[in-house]
Regions:
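Hydrophobic structural segments
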Residues: 1-127
Length: 127
């Protein structure tokens, strides 16, 4: 998915639909963080867009891509209004919680390519 001329976000489509409540519960279970949920218009969620960390500014790109829901780490005031106006759900799952898997994966990739080692130190952060 293209966010401001950079291929940073992702869009996925699932066969069956889920509800925003079900998705929020699944994310809370996997990320160990209670998401902030803007439920949109309650439509079944089939097309999901996501970008980890502080990607709330990409919500409009997710809407333009036809997403039923956008998942990211943070939320700002404009996203609340956009969710109400468009009916697209928005879940802010925590900046740290949504990025704690990417950093070790990237480090492992670099280590494999360069023959070095790394140690990831996961310091919990409520943000």
């Amino acid at each position: 998915m293209l966010f401001r001329s950079q291929d940073l976000g992702f869009v996925g489509t699932q066969d069956g639909a889920t509800t925003v409540e079900q998705l929020a519960a699944d994310l809370q279970s996997h990320l160990d963080r209670t998401p902030t949920v803007l439920p949109g218009d309650g439509r079944p969620l089939r097309r999901l867009a996501w970008c980890s960390g502080g990607a709330q500014g990409f919500f409009e790109a997710a809407i333009a891509a036809g997403a039923d829901v956008f998942l990211t780490g943070e939320i700002s005031e404009p996203q609340a209004h956009l969710s109400r106006e468009t009916g697209v759900a928005f879940l802010a799952c925590g900046h740290h919680a949504t990025e704690r898997y990417g950093a070790p994966a990237f480090a492992a990739h670099v280590c494999d390519a360069m023959g070095v080692t790394h140690r990831f130190i996961d310091i919990d952060n409520p943000a």
